[in-house]
C-alpha cells in the first residue's frame, strides 16, 4: 500500500495515510486515460451546429435564364452551391457526439489517473479542510502553505465555503469526491484532497 504524508492547512506534516493499492497503486494505463478524456470532452459538445443546403436556402426556385441561346453557362437555380448566397455542400448538421465507454474501462481510467498523481508525488492529503466563511485570500494562503498553485481541491462532500473561496483563483478548481474525473486530474498539477474524500473514493472504486 502506498503511503503519503498527511498535512494540515498550515502545510505541516501531521502523520501518514495509507492508500489502497487497487485505487492509488496500479500501473497507469495511458491509452485508457486518453480514451476517457476523449469521451468526456466529446460528451460536452452541444452538436447544435447547422448549415442550409440548396434545398433549405430561401429562394432559387426559378431558373435564372433560359437553357440555350444566351451564351452563358447553364443554370437551374440561383441557390446552387457554386453561386454566391447558394446552399452549403457537406456542411455540419446537428448530431450527437456522445461516446460511451464500458464501466470497467471508465473505472480503470480513474484509478490510473489517481495512481499517476501518487507516482508523480503530486498528491497532498489534508487531515481536514474547513472554512468559517468564504474567503479567497484564506484559500490562497492555504494553497501557498501546501505549495500547490495549480490544484484540484477535493472534499468529501460539497462545502460551499471551500467552493466559493477556491473558484475565483486562477488554476484552481474545487470538486467533491463523487465529481472527481480523469480530465481534471490530468489538467491540474496537484491533487489536494481531504482524508475523508480519499476514504469516499476508495469506498467506490476499491
From Swiss-Prot:
Q: Please indicate if the UniProt record lists Ribonucleoprotein as a keyword.
A: yes
Q: Where is the composition biased (Basic residues)?
A: 60-71
**Compositional bias segments (type: Basic and acidic residues):** 47-59
Naming one, the record's GO cellular component terms include: ribosome
Family matches, as Gene3D superfamilies? 3.40.1370.10
GO terms under biological process: translation
Q: Which Pfam families match?
A: Ribosomal_L4 (PF00573)
* Disordered: annotated span: 43-78
| UniProt keywords, alphabetically | Ribonucleoprotein, Ribosomal protein, RNA-binding, rRNA-binding
Ranges that cross the membrane: none
GO molecular function annotation: rRNA binding; structural constituent of ribosome
This molecule's function is given as: One of the primary rRNA binding proteins, this protein initially binds near the 5'-end of the 23S rRNA. It is important during the early stages of 50S assembly. It makes multiple contacts with different domains of the 23S rRNA in the assembled 50S subunit and ribosome. Forms part of the polypeptide exit tunnel.
- Entry's family note: Belongs to the universal ribosomal protein uL4 family.
**What binding partners and quaternary form does the record give?**
Part of the 50S ribosomal subunit.
Name of the protein described by the UniProt record: Large ribosomal subunit protein uL4
* Organism, scientific name: Desulforamulus reducens (strain ATCC BAA-1160 / DSM 100696 / MI-1)
Gene name, please? rplD
Amino acid at each position: 500500500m502506498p503511503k503519503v504524508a498527511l498535512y494540515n492547512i498550515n502545510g505541516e506534516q501531521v502523520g501518514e495515510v495509507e492508500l489502497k493499492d487497487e485505487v492509488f497503486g496500479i500501473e497507469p494505463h495511458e491509452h485508457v486515460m486518453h480514451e476517457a478524456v476523449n469521451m468526456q470532452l466529446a460528451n460536452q459538445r452541444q452538436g447544435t451546429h447547422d448549415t442550409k443546403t440548396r434545398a433549405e436556402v430561401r429562394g432559387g426556385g426559378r431558373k435564372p435564364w433560359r437553357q440555350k441561346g444566351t451564351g452563358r453557362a447553364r443554370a437551374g437555380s440561383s441557390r446552387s452551391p457554386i453561386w454566391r448566397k447558394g446552399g452549403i455542400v457537406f456542411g455540419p448538421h446537428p448530431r450527437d457526439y456522445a461516446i460511451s465507454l464500458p464501466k470497467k474501462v471508465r473505472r480503470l481510467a480513474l484509478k490510473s489517473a489517481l495512481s499517476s498523481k501518487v507516482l508523480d508525488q503530486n498528491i497532498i492529503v489534508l487531515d481536514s479542510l474547513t472554512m468559517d466563511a468564504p474567503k479567497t485570500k484564506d484559500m490562497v494562503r492555504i494553497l501557498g502553505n501546501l505549495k500547490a498553485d495549480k490544484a484540484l481541491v477535493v472534499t468529501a462532500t460539497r462545502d460551499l465555503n471551500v467552493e466559493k473561496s477556491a473558484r475565483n483563483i486562477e488554476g484552481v478548481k474545487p470538486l467533491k469526491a463523487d465529481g472527481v474525473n480523469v480530465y481534471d486530474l490530468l489538467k491540474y498539477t496537484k491533487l489536494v484532497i481531504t482524508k475523508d474524500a480519499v476514504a469516499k473514493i476508495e469506498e467506490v472504486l476499491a
